[in-house]
Amino acid sequence: MIADPAAISEHTIDLHAENFKNTRYDGRRFSLSNDTVTALERIVCSIQFIYGARDALPHSELADRANLVERLHPHSEFVVVPDAGHWVQYEAAADVNRLLLAFMTASA
């Protein structure tokens, strides 16, 4: 989840435990199925994908995911944040916020 084990604190563990406890959605089932592609095919607006370069969870290579996005949504944005893991928005909050604001401003 977190790329740098030194960044894991009691707060991080508590946050993950609370999120896990409140989850009502099985993301593993969705990410391992063709439902992801089907859902992406139905989206008609631009999409921004933000991944951490050190995310150990994708079930395919980031390059494969980027190619899929390019094929399905050539005008969308696929960004890989260096030195971040699956919790890219937690580990690289300033970078993710900057990317989101730039994307939303350009899309407005």
Label for each model-derived stretch:
Residues 1-45:
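Conserved alpha/beta-hydrolase catalytic His-Asp/Glu region
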Residues 28, 32, 60-64, 92:
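Residues at alpha-helix caps and immediate loop-helix transition turns in enzyme cores, especially N-
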Residues 73-108:
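Catalytic active-site module of serine/aspartate enzymes centered on a nucleophile-bearing elbow/loop
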Residues 48-84:
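Conserved loop-alpha-helix segment in the C-terminal half of the alpha/beta-hydrolase fold
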Residues 6-10, 59, 90:
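Non-catalytic, surface-exposed connector residues within folded enzymatic/regulatory domains
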Residues 1-5, 19, 50, 56, ...:
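Phosphate/oxyanion-binding loops and surfaces in catalytic or ligand/nucleic-acid-binding neighborhoods
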